[in-house]
Amino acid sequence: MTVNLNIVEKCVSCLNIKESYDLARHMEQEKTNPVLGYRTAGSLAERKTGDMLLEEMKKAGLTQVEKDKIRVDAWKFKKAVMRCHDREGTCREIQLGAYQTDFKTNGFQRFDLVYLGKGTADEYKDIDVKGKLVLIEINQREEWWINYPVYQAHLKGAAALIAVQSRGYAQIDDTALNAQDIAGPSCAPAFSMSRADFLMIRQLMEEKNENGNRVPELSVEFDADTEVLKDQYTYNIVGKIPGTDSDSMILLSAHYDSYFEGFQDDNAAVAMIIGIARALLRGGYKPRHTIVVCALAAEEWGISDTKYDWSTGAYRQVFEARPEWSGHVIADLNFELPAHAHSTRDAVRCTYEYADFVRGFVDAVQMPKGIYPEGMTTLYPIETWSDDFTMAISGIPSMVNDFSGGPFMENYYHSQYDNQDVYEEEVYKFHHEFYLRLLLAIDSLALPPMDFGRALAGSIESLDLDLCMQTGANGVLLLEKTEEAKKAAAILSEQVRRFNSIPEEKRDWKKADAITEKLLGVFRKSQDYLVRLDWDDNVIFPQQAVQNNLYALKKAMGYLEKGEIAPALEAFYSIDNNCYAFQFEREVFYHFTEYILKQSPDRLMWGKGRIIHHENLYDLVERLKEKKPGDSLEAEKQSLKEAWERQKRYYADDIEYLIRAAEKLRNLICEVSDMFEKGTE
């Protein structure tokens, strides 16, 4: 790569971290809830903030600054206030957070508030909650998401559910509230309460429970206004620095919707991408590729009653508003929570195809003292936590500053404590400088520096050949075809490297653009062929879901043969989403299964086609839970054998699919290789 170090250093010197910080704080002005904040999808607060960012981009000197209109389900959360009276008659008033659901009281209304533990199906036995508020504790990191107990309460006739974080999120202080995407229907209302207020409420419940009732209960007044409006609109804000040589683009992205104040998530990131662009313009940098700055709306949530209800703004942008970006954007640098050190080691998380290039850049970085004592590393593949996943599956190679690990997520994330108090100036400064340099390193290249071999290697490393032999799947042929594709990928990678090393004055940019479009086409096909999700939204290869199911089924069958029911049931927990069959009633389990398997594709968003198979063990779980020592298990053993046979067929199908995918990828890779020897026609 050829980077003019003088111009790089000049641009770095033009960075103004205080300016970025001030913009991040300025983004807090518009809010849907005057007490708690929130800048939610499709709300007036979000749109006004978008208008402000539009003007900021213009002031920074970006050109072609536009508002791209996108479809979303809008959420307006204005208030949620609860009142109760203690033994002395003093009125206690508390603020609640909310989820993306419908609940309007039109002023204070009286409700009975009942405490039901974790809100599982068993907690409701012989309990009438019709028209009542149900109070529960939840750990969304280690147990289940909010949608399960919320929908369970709704089916039981509860007026609404109120969740308190027992562990997992918002652990920084007992006064912390938490917010997440609901991943459920808007007709099942949900709110959040701080642990401090919960402890006060529980004490009042105990004091008033003079008759020793089994279920703690308290009369409260509640005033709430939260509403989901289907099929609304909002805007993504786009500005450009035009390229001088290439028709392709490099994207800087971050989202501008938020929970609470959202200083880290994601005000600081939006301010940073504008700050980097401003520094390039002040430094007089003339990019070879057009640099696009995009402030995305509706990342936290943007569509009702789907598992894939976040990253809506990014999905609408690249699949609907600007589908032409696919095939022309050579990299997306996405940002989340960039003004805080999430670990003792910093990291860039990227797609497989960019991993070698990013690692080479990261390894050469001189780390500043005092903020990341363990240095910096490269992680891959990308995860579904942020917009970069959506970008990747659209055909745009993406990366993000790694943020998903570390104590911030458990303590501050999506709480009112994500504010300026967690600002770390030296971290923010380092990320401005590092990603400006990385951006210019990518811009210095004629071709995107992708290597398709790493993803192919990963698919084979995840393959269990012993299981292939047990199930009759043709793993040997898959190995052979994948090795052929890897060899072709290695040749192509070297051709790309050599082309990028051509002196700038001798580059054929017309040829580079033609090859780039083909390279990005291969990348998109690789995403289509090789990227799947499990039921916990983890990124996996196509055969891994069934492979893991077969491991668990084998364990379970072994235990049942020995008459050991408890460990057999424990093995079921890792089979697709069957862990929820243990805690919630049938209708809950089926709703959140079928809204993935049977919902229309346009509502599955970035999760469309990423989960293929499902093994439904709900009835088997119910039967085994009722078994007593000495009961026959023959019917249950037979059910497990049938499940094993189904999964064997799925596995063989998945391996056959991967064989065809490897052949197709090899052919596509070879087509691009041929372009290096030919003209651009």
Segments (PLM) and residue ranges:
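Noncatalytic luminal/extracellular "stalk/propeptide" segments of secretory-pathway proteins
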Residues: 2-3, 10, 17-18, 22-25, ...
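Soluble metallo-hydrolase cores and metallopeptidase-like ectodomains found primarily
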Residues: 3-7, 93-126, 180-263, 274-285
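Second-shell loop/turn segments in exported
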Residues: 7-15, 34-44, 115, 137-143, ...
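Acidic/histidine-rich catalytic neighborhood of metal-dependent amide-processing enzymes
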Residues: 141-148, 152, 236, 258-353
